[in-house]
Amino acid sequence: LGLAVPVVQVVASGRLLKLGVLVKAPDALERLAQIDTIVFDKTGTLTLGEPKLTNVDTIAPDDLVLAAALATRSNHPLARAVSAAADGVSLPTLTNITETPGFGVEGEQDGETLRLGSRIWTDAEGPAASGPELWLRRGTNAPVQFTFADLLREDAKAVVNHLSKTYDVVLLSGDQKPVAKSVAEELGITNWAAEQTPADKIAKIDTMTKAGKTVLMVGDGLNDAPALKAAHVSMSPASAADISQTAADFVFQGTHLGAVADTLSTATRSRSLVFQNFGLAIGYNFIAVPLAVMGFVTPLVAAVAMSSSSLIVTLNALRLGLKSGTTPWTR
């Protein structure tokens, strides 16, 4: 009876480790098996998080180096793309640089305030890009637009389609509405919201929780960390910001989103095996103890039977490690 739960947890954690998923909390699998709603971030979670700057040829060199100087203080995928576009170029020294998660980075050069970030953060009024975007504002000058392309993870559509059959799938993105809408439509996600700040994401998760939903949050950015903590259980890719990995209950390696589905499947099967093990152990004792009291079971037989019951529970848990057929995504 004492082995019913721990042996399943050990086998499940070992199986997930082979799949490149680290289980960080002892009760994480149990909580994951209870969820009915999955909330995805977009950039770096549904996408590869390796955006490329697409309009670099139309950006003035001075604007690019200033943007890169600000971007070096952020771990956001779009900021990394700006830094990569200015690789090898000498960057100016800025002062009073601060990052506001979910909005952007601010600094000063010769008394002039510089901001690199979202449309709202920079008070930009230009046309929205068809993909992710950042804006650079220099003092009172008109903001300069930086546009990016970020590919979806190879298995994102198949995984979302698979999960949608069992769970409510939600997309909460910090990007502009056209970008979030495009990704949601491509993946078949009907419940989505754009221009979400960290506070907005927490509010959405709290609303779902109060409505009786049990939420899994999957995100990678610095601005996702509060939402990861607010959710019932959370997952983050290994490429995520350190604070997001710290906040998450699971961390998965690689570029495949299938790790999320595999972890959910493992958690569900683990819970089923725990109940089976309890049933086997209790049923065994329910039958064996009365027989022993009535003298039908000798001490030798009882000793062998006790060891056998532990073996049965262990072997039942080991079934979790057996391959359960093919999955509809690339691993």
Walk through the language-model features, giving the residues of each.
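Short, conserved catalytic or interaction motifs in soluble domains
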Residues: 3, 15, 34-37, 51, ...
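Short hydrophobic-aromatic micro-motifs
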Residues: 113-117, 236-237, 314
